[in-house]
Amino acid sequence: RSGKTVAMTVGFIMWAMTRFDGCNFAICGKTIESLRRNVTSNLPVWLAGVFSFKEHRTENKIVVSANGKSNSFYLFGGKDESSAALIQGITLAGILLDEVALMPESFVNQATARCSVEGAKLWFNCNPEGPSHWFYTKWVLEASRRKMLHLHFTMDDNLSLSASVKARYESLYSGVFYDRFIRGLWVVAEGLIYTMFNKDFHVVPSVPRPYEKYVMSCDYGTINPTSIGLWGKAGGKWYRMREYYY
């Protein structure tokens, strides 16, 4: 409820229409249905009197026009690994990924690789997940190196929310959900089995070691995925050498 979707979408459309003419852009969500429901169906309201919008539903395309300029905005859903194939081939001048943390990394990598027009920019928004999430480690923490502008939205940035509404939302959450959805922090989820996991400490290079003993571990995972590991003991430490994950 920080208003990030409105701010980012309006900003993206206005930037695209100011800088380009006759170009293709992409707006991506978890699914095209959720994208239409939460984002694109509201564009004529958010930008009333500024741009004209014409939707071509069979092509999943919206043509935006104003002052003699016209650009096409294609809609894509990034719900699973197979979605990456759907966005291949198109050349883009910019892309907006709404709720990017819900999308697989393969889709995002393919989508960002489509932006080859001179002056193209990448726009992302999301609610935080865990601190080991790929988008946090590879994009948020690398914002400076990637020359990205990182904006942290909270409910206080949404001037349309009254004090009573904000207070009600704050009372709905506690613990990790409060930290993520109210404070906007990338924190570890409660209930994780290995909350102490630290990638810098627990992940080591795969090199030959004088293993003296081997064991197999298996977590069947009645609800969660099955995980089978081959462990080797060397120098008083156990190393997970191989794994099967299904």
Residue ranges and their predicted role:
Residues 1-61, 136-137:
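Conserved P-loop
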Residues 216-226:
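Short acidic, Gly/Ser-rich segments with clustered Asp/Glu that frequently serve as metal-coordination loops
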Residues 34-93, 186:
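Inter-Walker segment of RecA-like/P-loop motor cores
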Residues 158-218:
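ATPase catalytic-site recognition across NTP-hydrolyzing enzymes
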Residues 3, 35, 102-104, 131-132, ...:
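Catalytic P-loop NTPase motifs of RecA-like helicase/translocase cores
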Residues 98-99:
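Walker B catalytic acidic pair
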Residues 230-246:
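Nucleic-acid-processing active sites and adjacent nucleic-acid-binding tracks
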Residues 102-172:
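ASCE P-loop NTPase helicase motor core
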